[in-house]
Amino acid sequence: DVCDSLVGGRCIHNGCWCERSAPHGNCCNTSGCTATFWCPGTLFD
């Protein structure tokens, strides 16, 4: 559920990517759309 630079900046266990400008905040989903969810506990969790 957290962003981890050790895994390429991906959010662990929720299938989205972290934005570089918000490494612990907003994520992008797999289709490239910006999601307004915080990394921990997203819909993808």
Swiss-Prot record:
Q: Which GO terms describe its cellular component?
A: extracellular region
* Residues found modified as 6'-bromotryptophan: W17, W38
Keyword Translocase present in the record's keywords: the answer is no
Free-text note on domains in this protein's UniProt record = The cysteine framework is XII (C-C-C-C-CC-C-C).
Tissue spec. comment: Expressed by the venom duct.
UniProt subcellular location: Secreted
Q: What does this protein do?
A: Mu-conotoxins block voltage-gated sodium channels. This toxin reversibly blocks voltage-gated sodium channel in cephalopods, with no alteration in the voltage dependence of sodium conductance or on the kinetics of inactivation.
Residues where 4-hydroxyproline is found: P23, P40
Record key words, sorted: Bromination, Disulfide bond, Hydroxylation, Ion channel impairing toxin, Neurotoxin, Secreted, Toxin
How is this protein named in the record?
Mu-conotoxin-like Cal 12.1.2e
Under the GO molecular function aspect, what terms does this record hold?
ion channel regulator activity; toxin activity
- Which residue pairs form cystines in this protein? C3-C16, C11-C28, C18-C33, C27-C39
Keyword Secreted carried by entry: yes
Top-level lineage group: Eukaryota
